[in-house]
UniProtKB/Swiss-Prot annotation:
GO cellular component: plasma membrane
Domain VWFA: 98-294
Protein name: UPF0353 protein MRA_1491
InterPro entries: Aerotolerance_reg_N, UPF0353, UPF0353/GerABKA_families, VWF_A, vWFA_dom_sf
Keywords: Cell membrane, Membrane, Transmembrane, Transmembrane helix
Localisation: Cell membrane
Any Pfam family the entry gives: BatA
Organism: Mycobacterium tuberculosis (strain ATCC 25177 / H37Ra)
Topology in membrane: Multi-pass membrane protein
Family assignment from sequence similarity: Belongs to the UPF0353 family.
Transmembrane segments: 18-38, 67-87, 309-329
Length: 335
């Protein structure tokens, strides 16, 4: 949790847990204090004249004299927690990652079951995704139907991606497997030239489609979608799939109405095989929400951050109160 003026405070993820051995020292000090109080009582009981004892004993309640010691022990406990180095999860923007946006431009994307059409809605939502993605991420764009084409190689130039989205053209058939293999090749190419680490940058494919793969018809074919998804899994590249449309979509081809229902099952299977997540959207608003969710997942990474400062501040406050209490409660005034 995060408290005002104190910052994040947790009791987990200790970086230096061996500092808790200092608690034995604190326990020893508490035991010593108790022994000193018992010895003090024994010395006071040596007075045979109880009237004399009452005249020299403090008039105020004796329990208040323990407040400074209690606050001191509390401060030591708080300092011990701080020294043990508690940590908390911190989300920071990624500055070294590759995302390939793979969009289906087959004829089924002409369907108007999503206003104004599946394609236009896809373009608008993808532009929003490009705008919101953290600046350090390299974003690439692939359009596919019967073949897959890299329209924009992974780059931090968002305008290039948005301009390419405006120029998407319809084509026949749907070769989802080829599109995934093309995305993996683009990721491997840019990963070889991006510096900043000893390992390739983290990568992800965002696959947007509305229908079944038609080329090849068997997704387990060597060039099929399921085979490509397994390859992505082997290369550590999860695929986030978005199936877009409704079961009632249709297009007019040669003056004939052709039903083009959305195919959720294939997309879910692709995501599952690759180790990614699947989403579905039937409206532009839902699609925007999906892209926003993906942006939060892809654009940020979670690291361990220091959470000891709040405990240090509380410890310092307790120590200051202990000193103040010692001055106010245990002061000696002349009589």
């Amino acid at each position: 949790m995060t408290l005002p003026l104190l910052g994040p405070m947790t009791l987990s993820g200790f970086a230096h847990s061996w500092f808790f051995l200092f608690l034995f020292v604190v326990a020893g000090l508490v035991a010593l204090y108790i022994l000193m109080q018992l010895a003090r009582q024994r010395r006071m009981l040596r007075f045979a004249n109880m009237e004399l004892l009452e005249s020299v004993a403090p008039k105020r309640p004796s329990r208040w004299r323990h407040v400074p010691a209690i606050l001191l022990v509390l401060s030591l406990l708080l300092f011990t927690i701080a020294m043990a180095g508690p940590t908390h999860d911190v989300r920071i923007p990624r500055n070294r990652a590759v995302v390939m946006l793979v969009i289906d431009v087959s004829q089924s994307m002409r369907a108007t079951d999503v206003e104004p059409s599946r394609m236009v809605a896809a373009q608008e939502a993808a532009k929003q995704f490009a705008d919101e993605l953290t600046p350090g991420i390299n974003l690439g764009l692939i359009a596919y139907a019967g073949t897959a084409t890299v329209l924009v190689s992974p780059t931090t130039n968002r305008e290039a991606t948005k301009n390419a989205l405006d120029k998407l053209q319809f084509a026949d058939r749907t070769a989802t497997g080829e599109a995934i293999f093309t995305a993996l090749q683009a990721i491997a190419t840019v990963g070889a030239v991006i510096g900043g680490g000893d390992t390739p940058p983290p990568a992800r494919i965002v696959l947007f489609s509305d229908g079944k793969e038609t080329m090849p018809t068997n997704p387990d074919n060597p060039k099929g979608a399921y085979t490509a998804a397994r390859t992505a899994k082997d290369q550590g590249v999860p695929i986030s799939t978005i199936s877009f449309g409704t079961p009632y979509g249709f297009v007019e081809i040669n003056d004939q109405r052709q039903p083009v229902p959305v195919d959720d099952e294939t997309m879910k299977k692709v995501a599952q095989l690759s180790g990614g997540n699947s989403y579905n959207a039937a409206t532009l608003a839902e699609l925007r929400a999906v892209y926003s969710s993906l942006q939060q997942q892809i654009g940020y990474e979670t690291i361990k951050g220091d959470a000891s400062v709040g405990w240090l501040r509380l410890g310092a406050l307790a120590l200051a109160l202990a000193a103040l209490a010692a001055l106010l409660i245990n002061r000696r005034l002349p009589t």
